[in-house]
Amino acid sequence: VYSVKGGDSLRLDRYTDTPAAEIDAKKPCMIFVFGGAFISGTRDAESYRPFFEYMAREQGYTVVSIDYRLGLKEPLAAGKLSPETFPQLLPQTVLMAVEDLYDATSFVAGKSAEWGIDPARIVACGSSAGAITVLQGAYFIANENPLTAKLPDGFDYAGVISFAGAVVDMADDLTWKRAPAPIMLFHGDADSNVPYRALRMGGAGIFGSDYIARQLSDMKSPYYFYSVEGADHALATVPMNNYRDAIDQFLTQQVGERLPAMIDTKERYSNSLPQDKDFTIETYIQSNFATK
């Protein structure tokens, strides 16, 4: 248990290939945040395990998969999730998830000596709702959000990996006070669960990977954007198994060696889906919650 919030005991699982007592040099760490539209999901889902084990055994990372509070679960169950309420509920939900991510990060950093972890090499990684959470965490650090007081003094992630994520802001645009940690973005441009570009809604916005990558490029901030034309929300999980070489390259060069590269890779499949260029708030709600 890394934190208790109300009636929720938030737990984490640690995956490592070498006991801390046998480690000569401190290992990098990956904190993973699961997906599930902020209404479902588990930190120990079987679909994630091969990726965790690969990162631990082949790449030498200690992987820490965390719980976080699912802020849309109760509003959905109570029938309070609608196009009218969503622009207020989503930012509150993401804020709560980032608070839990920061608490977990602080907990892990505090265990760094015991676990043989280098606190300067902690990478945040997430899928879907978890990807939104880690990107939001990086955005808050870059903008010195008051919530960052939960982190160790001067802390920043060594890198961030987002499998089909976005940043949520109560504004029509994202504004970065400074460049964030190196960011890797995977996204399909036919995703109907998380916008590939941007969705603006009642004074708030959900800014997807394409939008973020363009801003990072303008700032000359290191990033790796892996875009798949015609791919849907499968990019929330597929890269963990099928795009490991790209992930390894990002972690080695842009995170480990601090190579100031800005990489754009685009793939296209013969069975591509059409882009949803008119992504709306109704699209988001229908795709994520209609059958839940």
Task: Tell where the protein language model's regions lie, with residue ranges.
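N-terminal cap/lid segment of alpha/beta-hydrolase-fold proteins
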Residues: 1-25
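The feature captures the conserved acid-bearing segment of alpha/beta-hydrolase catalytic domains
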Residues: 148-220
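Short amphipathic alpha-helix adjacent to the substrate-entry channel of hydrolases
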Residues: 43-66, 73-75
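Alpha/beta-hydrolase active-site loop
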Residues: 83-114
